[in-house]
Amino acid sequence: NTPIGILAGDAILSLAFKHLKDSSNIVKEKFNGALIAVCEGQALDIEFESLSKVKMADYLNMIHLKTAYMLGLSSELGAIISGADSEISEMFKNFGLLVGKAFQLQDDLLEIISTQDQMGKTLMSDIILNKKTYLMIKAEEKFPAQLREIYLNNNNNNPKINKEIRNLIINSSIVE
């Protein structure tokens, strides 16, 4: 339910600001910068849905902003608040960025190769929503003709399109 999700997000953000009021300026600045980055990343994700092709570099930038940035921030702020110097804080930030990118790549992969029971959510929504994931960008690079044929031959039959695209990705070297 989108309206409830928006309200919950607003409430959580308000709580975060409440707890940040006594934090140092650097913590506040970094937190606010991360909010903007996440919004930019989410905007790119939505924009990409309407594009027929997205470059891998653009996808990696999008997941950097949308997912990795917040994990990098969390790691960095933990270091700053604990009194670590800037060099150590930067190391923690970089660690968090890598974890965030790995998380998003794994989530994209599991969306294709796992089962609904394993994931606890509806699968293949990335295909239905025309999300530009690592796997879909690679599939478009390696199999543009096959993907066009799948879409043309299935008359917008989403379950069949999803199954054929999933099989194409799983049976190729993309997943490896």
Each PLM stretch: what is its role?
Residues 1-176:
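All-alpha prenyltransferase/terpene-synthase fold signal
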